[in-house]
Structures are given as C-alpha cells and as structure tokens.
Amino acid sequence: MHKVTNIVVAGLGGQGVLKGTDILADVALRAGYDVKKSEIKGMSQRGGSVTGDVRFGHHVFSPMVPAGEADFLLVLEPTQVEPHRYMLRPGGVLITPDAVQADRLPSKKTLNVALLGALSALLDLPEEHWLAAIRANLPEKLHPMNLDAFQIGRRAAARLRP
C-alpha cells in the first residue's frame, strides 16, 4: 500500500486558507502525485472558520482527510488550533503562526505562504515546484513579498522537525 500524505489547513475567512490549499495541491501535481482537495467554508465571508484538506500520493481515492489522520495541520489563526487538533494523527506536526514568527513577515497577508514554506522543509517535494506554484497562483505584484514569506517559513521549519 502506498502512503498518502494528509494535510489540513485551517483559519478564518479572508486569511488565504483556500489559496494556500490551491498552492499546495499545485506543488503536489507538479511533483507527479495524484492529488485530491476539499474545502469547508462555513461563514467564511464573515470571518468564520475555513478548512481545506489536501491529500496526495500515488493513488488517492477521497478528498477528505479522515479525523486523526492528518500528517500536518497548518493553522493560520490561533483560535482554530483546538477545534482542529483532533484531525492530527499521533506524531503529526502542527504548524502555527508562532512557528514562522508571523510578526516578522512582510505582510500579515503572506502568513499562508509562510506556513507553506515551513511545510515545504518537512516534505520531500522539490523547492522549485513550490516557487513555481506560488508564482502560478498569485498575481505577479504579490510575488516578491510571498516568495520572501516562503523563505522565512522554510528557515523557521528547523524548529518543527518531528
């Protein structure tokens, strides 16, 4: 049986949860994996909870990450840690704004990409795929600050290794 990597991204409406899952799915596709993605928007337009699941591997059958099976949980808003912690498998990795020193980012709107930067250092996916996916999924004027945020997150990941 081939391993499927399960990732959950959680936050509030307007924080870029879904854009983050778009970038992540793009990276896995570029790496040649079968990718499935799902999202739960809730009251996202009013700042409510938003969750995105990304699963990739050689054969992925369902887009939803089963409870207790997430290898990684990326949380953009600290209040969303506890409501989503049950998604992590034992030994899974939680990545929060504190992990990437969010106060040092070029903009708070780059937090989603900074968390992806941290994740990128923990996954065996080529860095060039991450950079290409960021460029492909964001407007050109946002590339410099998001590429900076990605590298900040990537450097911060040394503290997250399981």
Show where each model-derived region lies.
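Active-site cofactor/cluster-binding pocket
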Residues: 1-162
